[in-house]
């Protein structure tokens, strides 16, 4: 998976949140969405992303939440297959 070409992920200090920038505006990401998207680099698989997040946040069962968010992001056109 990778970010779609028209989007740029950026930490927005004024918003105190990760945002997706695109030509027409900005999407403020809630919760762990930014943490997930920072791990999308065109090389990691979904399982790699889940494993990386599990290491960063031990004790949390994140797999289904990550998969649900990735499906949402794909449906919105924020991410695309490599």
Predicted regions and their residues:
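Acidic, low-complexity/disordered tracts enriched in E/D and polar residues
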Residues: 1-38
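Long, charge-rich, low-complexity alpha-helical segments
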Residues: 25-82
């Amino acid at each position: 998976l990778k970010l779609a070409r028209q989007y740029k992920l950026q930490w927005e200090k004024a918003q105190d949140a990760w945002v997706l920038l695109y030509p027409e505006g900005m999407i403020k990401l809630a919760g762990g969405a930014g943490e997930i998207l920072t791990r999308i680099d065109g090389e990691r698989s979904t399982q790699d992303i889940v494993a990386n997040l599990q290491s960063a946040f031990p004790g949390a069962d994140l797999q289904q939440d990550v998969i649900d968010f990735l499906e949402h992001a794909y449906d919105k056109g924020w991410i695309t297959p490599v």
